């Protein structure tokens, strides 16, 4: 995806009041997935979506009515607690579910009554590693980051001359 869609509209509001606060990290335009469980519960890890100061429990949300026909198969791996399986479905699946979640959490959504009981306060959860990370290569491309790190090793010359012309990648595991 090279452009943003209407789920990123700055004017979009949520029925989750805390998601509309100017200083929130998780407005309706930013719906990150994560792995959580209720603090001290010892229950199984679940996949959720942060919204305002809440987490939408996708295991509970998947069982609620009102989803379009193409959404339950996308929620199934998340309801089972498997973010890797969901990511393996590809970009179209992610965009489709993002749109469905945005509509469901938007102000005036007919799903509000069904989904409100699926919210858990972020302050009442503990977070876990969201997925199984097998391998990765990191590309060192942020000039501000590269400058800050370079100052640690070479305070007088933080960026080497080739930085802007030669991609720098390294194995991260």
Regions found by a protein language model. Give the residues of each.
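Helix-enriched interaction subdomains in cytosolic or periplasmic regions
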Residues: 2-4
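Short, solvent-exposed loop/turn segments that connect beta-strands within catalytic domains
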Residues: 39-44
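Active-site microenvironments in enzyme catalytic cores
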Residues: 6-38, 50, 57-173
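Short beta-strand-centered aromatic/proline hotspots
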Residues: 45-49
């Amino acid at each position: 995806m090279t452009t943003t869609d209407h789920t990123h509209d700055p004017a979009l509001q949520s029925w989750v009041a805390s998601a509309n606060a100017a200083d929130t990290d998780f407005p309706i335009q930013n719906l990150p997935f994560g792995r959580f469980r209720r603090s001290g519960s010892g229950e199984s890890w679940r996949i959720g979506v942060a919204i305002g100061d809440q987490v939408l429990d996708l295991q509970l949300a998947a069982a609620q009515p009102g989803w379009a026909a193409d959404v339950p198969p996308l929620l199934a791996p998340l309801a089972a607690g498997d973010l890797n399986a969901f990511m393996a479905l590809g970009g179209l699946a992610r965009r489709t579910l993002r749109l469905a979640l945005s509509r469901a959490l938007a102000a005036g959504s007919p799903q509000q009554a069904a989904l409100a009981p699926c919210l858990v306060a972020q302050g009442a959860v503990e977070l876990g590693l969201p997925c199984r990370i097998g391998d990765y290569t990191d590309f060192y491309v942020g000039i501000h980051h590269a400058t800050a790190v370079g100052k640690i090793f070479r305070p007088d010359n933080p960026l080497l001359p080739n930085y802007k012309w030669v991609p720098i990648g390294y194995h991260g595991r």
